[in-house]
Amino acid sequence: MGCSLSGLNAFYDAVSGGGDVWINENRFRIVRQLGEGGFAFVFLVKEVVADGLARKKSINPSHISDDGTYAMKKIIIQTEEQLELVRQEIRVSSLFSHPNLLPLLDHAIIPVKGMQDGLLKHEAYLLFPVHLDGTLLDIAEAMQLKKESFTTITVLHIFRQVCGGLKHMHSFDPPYAHNDVKPGNVLITHRKGQPPLAILMDFGSARPARKEICSRSEALQLQEWASEHCSAPFRAPELWDCPSHVDIDERTDIWSLGCTLYAIMYGTSPFEYVLGESGGSLQLAVMNAQVKWPSGLNPPYPESLHQFVVWMLQPQPAARPNIDDIIIHVDKLITKYSP
């Protein structure tokens, strides 16, 4: 983290139209933009000098691209609060090492002058392995349009991998919660003759999971934080309406996992249906765990998967399973439904 001359070069090259970005000692050429949101842009980039990253001892060799292409996230930072949030994301991302969690390969935060006001601001560049098949959300939406769906065993294999990544986070001391588990934060890579590879990403909302709430003020602060960092259709009830005296823990992620399993099957959160109803309230649907199942004579998935979702979507956190319980259960289902 921090600033360097090479980091400043990233700014000047971009302004002059060179299309090259330096992240510390490695230079990357921007190939094309992959996406954007808020103050962040994601680009497909390619190493200008081959094998530059391969010489960094801190990077797992399995994360080095064969063709030198990577994903680069550029974040425009305008306030000190935003700067601290980016630093927090970098710190947290650097903690994790698991096949189903997206690794942060390198990063740089650089000072730049604002183009209009001339004030000193910052830009952050975060480098990751690239997964061009898109997110689980992208794929699920495309399949819904074509009236297609994953097979039961593929649903379970994808879900099992997300659980594996989350278990790694929950196993820290103290445990970390992701706080924004959803299909849009799961990258998918198709593999010939194997189930798709699923990788949980975006640790901008990840924090130590356990927090003691001792007052109404603290409860309201948590609700406000959750409204900004936890996607509403996948947000646990205790983050919508937090009691004044309660212990919050990693079971907020378990609720989101239940919503995600539903979404892998049906392409949407189990509660978003209310947004299409007159006077419908997403918060009330979540607080009451009002899951709406698709109707039809021939449901595409067995009742055991529906029961699995319901097990995770318990309004009271103490009634939800932990990640180890979930993994044991999904492994049993994989054995049951394997061809």
Predicted regions and their residues:
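Juxta-kinase regulatory segment immediately upstream of eukaryotic protein kinase catalytic domains
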Residues: 1-23, 31
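Protein kinase glycine-rich loop
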Residues: 31-38, 42
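Short beta-strand micro-motifs within the conserved protein kinase catalytic domain, predominantly
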Residues: 103-122
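Catalytic-loop of the protein kinase fold
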Residues: 170-190
